[in-house]
């Protein structure tokens, strides 16, 4: 189940409800914060349920909306935001739990293009806001940009959040790699990398709470990034050790003539940076890296013109799960986590029962 970042539904049963389901990475968490900030400016009495998960499969999305709809019904005054991740499956949407409310999907993943739903009548009332050239966080800011013409308070909020959204976008869609050496670009690159470090060290809940609670600060940008820079130093020490480990355990796999490196044992919090170091190490000469982990998922990273979103999508389909993502960063599930847990419990209980009779 997804993590609950904020739940104020008990504050009022009559007030408009805002439900946000977002991706559990830095981009998704900043996105959720931006939506909440602007929605509260529009009506401070609104109630919120904000949930996040790194598992963006259709199976997980359907389960999360089962939970959301079990305890609430939604009407025309309510809003449901699905950020940086896919909408529920067509089969789930056909049950029409969300048919009478406002559903907004803001995303930028190649495998979540709105065109794939054009022939599905159950998706006709979903508003899609999609652009693969921007991160989810910056798309959220652009979504609310028309409001700045209505009031100075919206303009101030937009200006306060833009540096964070810009740096988040720079990290998430990898444009930090193309920045130059001017003072402005070096600062932007440092901010982009520190956002990833902060989210990975703090975890989703603490990261979201920090960027939210600091919103009332007059020096918002300086305060959050000064803290993120400190966390970035600690993160980089860990990265150096993990890179040495990755080089020792990586194994080769030939995929359609590409040299693919397979690594087991690197936590998801460190995979993007480790992959970047491996892919651009000329001695290693890998074109694709695949990370396998204990949660039953595979994360792909690539360079040049290799589209791993297609690889992840096809692999997910073959093993019975959904998959996808960006051209150079994608993932899918290949094992059921609940089944893995069940198997471990069975082995544990069986072995413990044997110990009792020894």
Where does each model-flagged region fall?
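Hydrophobic, aromatic-enriched interface-forming segments
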Residues: 170-251
